[in-house]
Amino acid sequence: MSAVEQHIPNDQFLQKLTAFYRDSKIRGPKSVYVTMKPYDGRTKAMPKGSTFKEGDEISCIFRAKWGSKKIATEVKAKEVNKFHTQYSAIIVAQMVNLEKRKKTDDEKKKTGATKA
């Protein structure tokens, strides 16, 4: 992406996010990073201590990164529920990719002591 971030449509973002998860399972880096922040259309940072005004139309910006590939979309307040439902479905479908974390010896001792 360039210095000014280009936002893609929500449906296209979800399709590319699904492709990121699928590709991360097959090849390349395993981690897909997704962030969500409030967004009011500014391209420059807000001064410290300032907040959104009540009259402002607040939306959310979703960003995803997999390896060197980055995508972003702006979700308007009216579309949040629809987007969140679709996003949740993608996350649930991709949970099969999660790997169980291996416990260290210290963690095994702690859990064994609490069970007794």
From Swiss-Prot:
InterPro entries: Signal_recog_particle_SRP14, Signal_recog_particle_SRP9/14. It is found in: Cytoplasm. The keyword RNA-binding applies. One of its GO terms (cellular component) is signal recognition particle, endoplasmic reticulum targeting. Gene3D superfamilies: Signal recognition particle alu RNA binding heterodimer, srp9/1. GO terms for molecular function: 7S RNA binding; endoplasmic reticulum signal peptide binding. It comes from the Eukaryota. Keywords: Cytoplasm, Ribonucleoprotein, RNA-binding, Signal recognition particle. One of its GO terms (biological process) is SRP-dependent cotranslational protein targeting to membrane. Pfam families: SRP14. Belongs to the SRP14 family. Heterodimer with ZK512.4/SRP9; binds RNA as heterodimer. Component of a signal recognition particle (SRP) complex that consists of a 7SL RNA molecule of 300 nucleotides and six protein subunits: srpa-72, srpa-68, SRP54, F37F2.2/SRP19, F25G6.8/SRP14 and ZK512.4/SRP9. Component of the signal recognition particle (SRP) complex, a ribonucleoprotein complex that mediates the cotranslational targeting of secretory and membrane proteins to the endoplasmic reticulum (ER). F37F2.2/srpa-19 together with F25G6.8/srpa-14 and the Alu portion of the SRP RNA, constitutes the elongation arrest domain of SRP. The complex of F37F2.2/srpa-19 and F25G6.8/srpa-14 is required for SRP RNA binding. This is Signal recognition particle 14 kDa protein. It comes from Caenorhabditis elegans.
